[in-house]
Amino acid sequence: MARSLKKGPFADEHLLKKVDAILEGKMPKKPIKTWSRRSTIFPSFIGLTFQVHNGHQHIDVYVTDDMVGHKLGEFVPTRTYSGHGAEKGKKK
């Protein structure tokens, strides 16, 4: 389901504070490590790199203008697909 328009987009407060600190020059421009896959990407995030957790490790995500409005978690898959395995030793 989509989020109600009257509520507006969501991003974790700690993530917004880190982005603002980087844009103001208070923090060095290095990747921001986050577990917040649910946060919406805002236009102020463009050009920054986030390390988004996929349940196992942090994956680097460089934000471009096409990503605005999407969630951070959309760009980091949580599951690996190894294909439908053929049975070993099966002959036709």
Curated annotation (Swiss-Prot):
Gene3D superfamilies: 30s Ribosomal Protein S19, Chain A (3.30.860.10). One of its GO terms (biological process) is translation. GO terms for cellular component: cytoplasm; small ribosomal subunit. It comes from the Bacteria. The keyword Phosphoprotein does not apply. PANTHER family: RIBOSOMAL PROTEIN S19P FAMILY MEMBER (PTHR11880), SMALL RIBOSOMAL SUBUNIT PROTEIN US19M (PTHR11880:SF8). Belongs to the universal ribosomal protein uS19 family. NCBIfam families: rpsS_bact (TIGR01050). Protein S19 forms a complex with S13 that binds strongly to the 16S ribosomal RNA. This is Small ribosomal subunit protein uS19. It comes from Mycoplasmopsis agalactiae (strain NCTC 10123 / CIP 59.7 / PG2).
